[in-house]
């Protein structure tokens, strides 16, 4: 599997102009996310175009588990923002609403982290964020 490596971890902290969606990863049958790739891509495109994230990392059951019909899509979105992470995640969910009616009704668990904040959390031994970076799948 193409999980994030330590090298990828450090790429999070390098400035990136615009994230690009890695459709080849989304459609790779080795990853559980391939089953919803066509439904997920419009959401990711909107996210990249409207919110300009540095990176989008998929974690949870669609990355390395066995997603069920009731599974949500867990995303770590790395980006600078003037809003609080919670406010930014709420804005993203609101932007997704029209797609839920026109494309596919996917449920999301969205976590937004500033690159510097994420680096500090990992440096302080934050196991949760470290595991996401180490085991997640970088989608953009």
Where in this protein do the model-derived segments appear?
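Short beta-strand->loop micro-motif that forms the acidic, two-metal-ion catalytic signature
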Residues: 74-78
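Glycine-rich beta-strand-to-loop/alpha-helix junction loops that act as flexible
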Residues: 59-61
């Amino acid at each position: 599997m193409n999980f994030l490596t330590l090298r990828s971890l450090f790429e999070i902290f390098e400035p990136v102009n615009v994230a690009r969606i890695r459709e080849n990863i989304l459609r790779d049958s080795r990853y559980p996310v391939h089953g919803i790739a066509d439904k997920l891509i419009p959401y990711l495109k909107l996210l990249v175009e409207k919110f300009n994230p540095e990176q989008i990392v998929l974690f949870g059951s669609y990355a390395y588990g066995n997603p069920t019909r009731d599974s949500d899509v867990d995303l770590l979105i790395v980006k600078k923002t003037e809003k609080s992470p919670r406010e930014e995640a709420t804005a993203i969910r609101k932007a997704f609403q029209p797609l839920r009616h026109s494309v596919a009704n996917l449920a999301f668990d969205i976590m937004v982290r500033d690159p510097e904040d994420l680096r500090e959390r990992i440096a302080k031994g934050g196991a949760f964020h470290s595991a996401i970076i180490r085991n997640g799948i970088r989608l953009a």
